Structures are given as structure tokens and as C-alpha cells.
Amino acid sequence: MDRYFFILTTIDLFVLGFMCFLTRLSESLNKKQKRGFFLAFALIAAISVLEVITIVVDGTPPGCRWLNILSNYLGFGLTPAVALCLVYVLDKKTIIRRGFKAAVCCEGGYLLFLAATLPYGPVFSVSAENLYARGGYFFIYVIMYYASMLYLMAATVRTAAAFQNRSHPLIYPLILFLGAETVIQIAFPALHVTWLCVTLLSVLYYIYCSEMWNQLDALTGLLNQNSYLNRTAEMRRSGGVLVVFDVDDFKQINDRYGHLQGDVCLAEIADCIKKAYARCGYCYRIGGDEFCVLLKDEASEARCAATLQSLLAERRKTLTILPTVSLGSAAFSGEDVVAVKDRADRALYCAKKEQKARAAAAKPADSEEKD
């Protein structure tokens, strides 16, 4: 076996082993994410070893033919599953989405197809002399491989967009890099660099996802305070709008119904803010019950605010304790964000006073109706 390939595989396995331990010891990943990354790294390591086995046993006495067939079958069959493991980590929720279930079924069907057609060798064959050869329908493997990569790319871009991650275009060059490498591998079969590249991609993907999740608030899924501070630290622009939100009488919700119900209310409010404003700006949770949005322009402000109030009213039909939300805004006009934030806060306080006045005026009317 080529010593160069053996050295690459050794480096590959070391990196994957390190990533497995890093995943296991991580305190920022939940159990589902740890499981997905661990399976992906372990699967890449296993397929890398299988590739070594196929090279070692190919052309040896026919007694090793079964090992050659098994190693190639598992290598070709399990390759698309790597992308599925990485898709699995994207959603922190324990619920398995329908699209992912369909992808798993496709992978299962592909494995069954490979097993059923082993005697005929459409994808690959191992002769009686124990010599490997690509089959006439080798493109089936290539299609499954590229389909899994495209599925990973689409799922990642969709998730990153939902999390308002500005670096989501970076996933495209990662997939293109792997796709180009695969073309080279197909054209030059003796050049065994596929799984080294897949290892590199998986490590970069781990870094990418960690960076994406580190920008999020764990409870609400909005961008967190640190993201807000970094984004606005030296921000000076014109044409945009800073909108700040505060939950009215939120302390009473916590005192009366408990902090768990308070968290439910915050999550619902955050979801409404994202649905109302995400297409027009970036949404942040900057404090306990404080949120803000950096709008791209003033034109969408009134429409987004109306949409938010409509969404909150709709949610209040099922979650009756959902409190009202006051907001204030200020346009950017070239000054630093601190000055803009101060003006937005003053507008917010005026809105809260008006909200309290309306609530106080409504109470006597309610009492008269009851009498």
C-alpha cells in the first residue's frame, strides 16, 4: 500500500478521534447534537478504515474476496449517511422532521439495493480472482453521494437563514470544494484523498455550526446580546431603524405563574418578533424581557409593528397569560448606536406609559360591565 496514503489515513483517524473527544466533552452541545456529530466523525473514521482494507485485500488470494466485497459494500453504502448525521445536528429539537425521515428511508433503500445487486455488480464488482472494478452503473453511487451533499447544503442554508446567520453563504464553497474533489477522485481512482477532504469538511462544519449557535439566545432562538453588542459596537449608518421592545408587567407573570411559564411567554413573544421582523432586519434578545430589531429601512417599520401586534393577539387566544409588548424606535442618522438606543428607549418608555394608562382606563369599564 502507498505509504503516503497510509500516512494520510493515520492523520485522518487522529483528527477524527480528537473531534470525537471534543464533541463528547463539549458543554455547548445538547445530547442530540453530540450524538449527531459523534456518529458523523465515527462513520467517517470507519469508512476511512474500510477504504484501507479494500486496498490491502484487493488482488490477494481469493480467500479474502468476501472481505473485499464487504468493505466495498459498507464503504459505498454508508457514505451518504455522513451527510444525514450532519443534518441531524442542525435542529436542537428532539422531534425528527418528515424530510429527514424521508432521507433516512432513501439511505435504507440504497443499502438494500446495493445488497440485493451484489451478485450482479451494477455499482462495483469483485472478480473470482479478488480484483475490484467499478460497475456500469457506478453513477448510482455518485448520484447518492451528491444528493446527500446537496441535502446537507440546503438544510444548513435554511437553518442558518432561520437563525439570521449572516455567514450562511459560506456553506456553498464548502460543498463546492467537496464536489470538485469528488470529481477529481472519480477521474483519478488511484488518488485516495476523498475521506481526508470529508474529514476536513466535517471539522469545518463543526466550527461553522458552533459559531452559528454561539450567536443565538438559548431560550428564544433570536440572536443574543453578545451578537448585538458586537454588531453595533462601531455601527454608524443612515436609513436604518433601531426598534426596542419590552414585555409589559413581566415580573407579575413570573410571580403569579412561575418562571417556567414566564419562559414560555418569552419564547412565544420572540417567535412573534422574528415572524414579524426577520425579513426586514435582525432580531435580538438583549436582556431578560428586552428585545430589539435592527431594521434595514424605515419603510417597513409600521407594517412590521402591525404584524407583531396581530401575531401576539392570535397567540393570546391559546396562551391567555401572554402579556402585551411595548416598543419604541429611533432612526439612524449618522450618530453612534448609543445615542440611537437612548432615543429608542425614551420612545419605549412613552409607549409603556400610554399602555398603562389604557389598561387603567379599561379596568373601571370592565367593572361597570360586570355590575
Named regions from a protein language model:
Residues 3-11, 116-151, 185-191:
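Extracellular-loop-to-transmembrane junctions of the mid-late helices
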Residues 8-64, 68-86, 104-121, 170-186:
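Hydrophobic alpha-helical transmembrane segments of multi-pass membrane proteins
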Residues 19-23, 85-89, 142-163:
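Alpha-helical transmembrane segments in multipass membrane proteins, preferentially the mid-helix core
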Residues 24-37, 91-101, 157-168:
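Membrane-interface helix-boundary motifs at transmembrane edges
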Residues 154-157, 161-219, 226-240:
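Signal-transducing coiled-coil linker helices
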Residues 224-241, 251-278, 284-288, 292-293, ...:
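Conserved long alpha-helical elements within nucleotide-processing catalytic cores of c-di-GMP signaling
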Residues 285, 312-332:
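Catalytic core regions of nucleotide second-messenger enzymes
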Residues 309, 326, 330-371:
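Catalytic-core segments of nucleotide cyclases and related cyclic-nucleotide turnover enzymes
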